[in-house]
């Protein structure tokens, strides 16, 4: 978790045959692994009017950081961004996306590239904005996301999005909001992932400490801790 290797660009909008002819706009993606294949999910618009033509594309590879080939996009999803794919212990995969206060989720077929039924709204999320992430801890499902917080904090700096979470007994809810687990960074919005590595849980997020510009963000990671009742402690952001 200290020494990292930059493997370079793994996908470009020029490789997306159904994408907007002007290219660009490949925003926050996700990647899942199943049966020897890595599935890379990315939001990309298909038309010049990019704001209303988002699709969730799928590219696959047998390696995690190279060789990805675009296979198409998932049909039947609303034009939203920020895909998240969660594979449960029984092998069933779920996909989520959202933005603008809307969060939806649904089952994926075994091929990981088609919906198994309809996407449905995720009920019970308090002040949802974007950046869905789902993980499982002690038999419970956790859905984390960035909120719409936009108030001043005690340091006088314009407030940015906080990271919230909700808990459920089902990967598709209904969800019970549990509050905030990360205060704002300096990059306006935030997009977090919660993962376990060698017995320790970590919170991945981003800030703009290196660039000084809230649209040029760097990946950060800090340890994450649960309370005995399953709630998440506020993550301490380190430098």
Where are these regions (language model features)?
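Carbohydrate-active catalytic/glycan-binding domains of CAZyme proteins
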Residues: 1-239
